[in-house]
């Protein structure tokens, strides 16, 4: 199943290559005025603009202006220069860009951007919206998932012309690199698309459509001026799509926030815009984390010292590379998720008889007796993520804690947070998902955000903050020990119910990433202090994270006591 569509993708690439070759044959056979000779005899942009006008007039004949004649793209707020439809062919393909940027193309092809539309995880969900409310409502999604189809006027029940080739490519090079300006950071496609141009002429006027590679390499400065804007390197650029809301137009209820990664980043220490964070971090943007420099394994003219700016946009999506067999992308995604994003601290033990707190574990001497009833306090710190855990679509992305008590033979005596044989998570597990409810209080499990009226739970961890999870267990009465307690945080795209909805229930198990783990040994009798492990936080920080978690639980007296311990250890903090 994982590689089922690879053949189709290869066929598609071959067809695109043939189209590209045909275009250049036309240029060399007498229409070269558009491609060579300084482009003096006819400006290619004039032809593109004329074609656009004719195309738009034809598309307007059957287009459904459900939200008003002057608002063709609502509920998305994406706009395009000229305020009318544009033919899909006006966007040079990613294969065209591949000619000079093979490494970037290779990375992009495996990215979520390149697969933003075609995956069943997306199409099955948006299909519910189209069938229940109408195709026009899916424009809410397509401003970010399939902009070429949105701006070409094909997100309508009966388009006058149909060209769905770009469905396979999602967000292409010339989608991102044709955005001319940003609207206020509302998300939901808060950008203004330009008519794609890969080069400027001598007067600084955009040359629409494809030009010869010889022209580009002869005038690289004019190519860069056409396809790069300073704001492409800002968080606000990413916020245009990585922030969203549910307008009343979509839900027939009221405006609701959907995702807010940009807002969460602003509240983090990485942004340097908020007084609220507890820890100081170096300034980092979306691009710092998700577009680091990466070794260029293929030819690419933008290579510097063997690297290019990554066009993988590695984050948490393991499902797309697993589905399409992109092993390299999957490997890097799993490595990214495990790269010190979280800290799991088995911070304390509490006896259920109320005889006191043993904290922080590892720094105090304490006794354990057979039959003791204990509570482990697990503190989970979001230490390396610039937004929440879970980010974005919190209702179907799944992160949770797993806890185990094992004996000396490895036998599991107590467990929480396991997956059953069918891939479903223990319903009693501590999960970081958000549960969405419709107007009647029904749980929404297929990401039907247009039916959402309220949120039942939201257990996500804000950037730089912590949460506290408690686990009760009993030491066996006849046990001799030693015993081991282990806590870890797991993550997967997507929860089993949503994966089954998208793929059916015959799919292989989808990857689960172990983001952080910590174990401690409990002996019968005396347990002495032990040396900290390299991944452990300093003692003052362990108390601080415990206090932060208590503060967020509104346990103010207990939080104050924890922070008092911090000031004893760090008077300068």
Question: Which role does the model predict for each range below?
Answer:
Residues 45-88, 104-137, 153-463, 469-538, ...:
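Primarily the internal scaffold of c-type cytochrome electron-transfer domains
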């Amino acid at each position: 199943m994982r590689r089922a569509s690879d053949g189709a993708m290869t066929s598609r690439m071959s067809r695109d290559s043939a189209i590209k070759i045909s275009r250049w044959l036309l240029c060399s056979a007498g229409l070269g005025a558009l491609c060579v000779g300084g482009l003096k005899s006819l400006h290619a942009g004039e032809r593109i603009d004329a074609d656009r006008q004719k195309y738009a007039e034809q598309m307007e004949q059957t287009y459904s202006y459900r939200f008003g004649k002057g608002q063709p793209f609502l509920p998305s707020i994406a706009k395009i220069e000229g305020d009318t439809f544009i033919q899909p062919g006006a966007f040079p393909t990613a294969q065209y860009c591949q000619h000079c940027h093979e490494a970037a193309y290779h990375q992009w092809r495996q990215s979520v951007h390149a697969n933003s539309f075609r995956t069943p995880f997306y199409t099955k969900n948006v299909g519910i919206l189209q069938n229940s409310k109408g195709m026009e409502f899916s424009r809410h999604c397509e401003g970010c998932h399939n902009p070429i189809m949105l701006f070409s006027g094909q997100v309508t029940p009966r388009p006058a012309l149909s060209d769905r080739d770009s469905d396979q490519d999602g967000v292409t090079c010339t989608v991102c690199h044709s955005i001319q300006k940003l609207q206020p950071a509302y998300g939901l496609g808060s950008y203004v698309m330009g008519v794609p141009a890969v080069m400027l002429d001598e007067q600084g006027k955009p040359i629409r459509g494809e030009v010869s590679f010889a022209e580009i390499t002869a005038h690289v400065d004019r190519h860069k001026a056409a396809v790069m804007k300073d704001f492409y390197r800002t968080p606000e650029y990413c916020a245009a799509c990585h922030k969203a809301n549910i307008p009343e137009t979509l839900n027939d209820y009221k405006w609701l926030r959907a995702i807010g990664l940009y807002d969460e980043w602003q509240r983090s220490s990485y942004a340097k815009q908020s007084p609220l964070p507890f820890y100081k971090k170096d300034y980092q943007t979306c691009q710092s984390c998700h577009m680091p420099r990466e070794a260029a394994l293929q030819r690419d003219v933008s290579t510097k010292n063997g690297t290019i700016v990554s066009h993988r946009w590695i984050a948490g999506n393991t499902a797309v590379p697993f589905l399409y067999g992109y092993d390299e992308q999957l490997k890097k995604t799993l490595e990214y998720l495990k790269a010190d994003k979280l800290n799991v601290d088995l911070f304390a033990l509490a006896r259920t008889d109320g005889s006191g707190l043993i904290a922080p574990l590892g720094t105090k001497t304490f006794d354990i007796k057979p039959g003791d009833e204990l509570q482990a306090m697990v503190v989970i710190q979001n230490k390396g993520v610039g937004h929440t855990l879970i980010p974005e679509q919190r209702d179907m992305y799944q992160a949770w804690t797993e806890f185990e008590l094992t004996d000396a033979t490895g036998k599991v005596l107590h467990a929480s947070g396991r997956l059953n044989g069918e891939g479903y998570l223990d319903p009693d597990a501590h999960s970081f998902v958000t549960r969405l409810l419709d107007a009647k209080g029904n749980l929404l499990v297929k990401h039907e955000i247009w039916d959402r009226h309220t949120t039942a739970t939201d257990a996500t961890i804000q950037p730089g903050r912590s949460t506290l999870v408690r686990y009760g267990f009993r030491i066996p009465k006849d046990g001799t020990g030693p015993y081991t307690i282990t806590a870890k945080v797991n993550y997967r795209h997507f929860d089993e119910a949503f994966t089954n909805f998208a793929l059916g229930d015959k799919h292989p198990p989808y990857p689960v990433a172990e983001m952080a783990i910590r174990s401690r040994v409990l002996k019968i009798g005396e347990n002495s202090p032990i040396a900290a492990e390299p991944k452990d936080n300093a003692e003052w920080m362990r108390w601080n994270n415990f206090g932060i978690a208590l503060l967020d639980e509104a346990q103010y007296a207990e939080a104050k006591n924890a922070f008092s311990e911090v000031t004893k250890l760090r008077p300068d903090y």
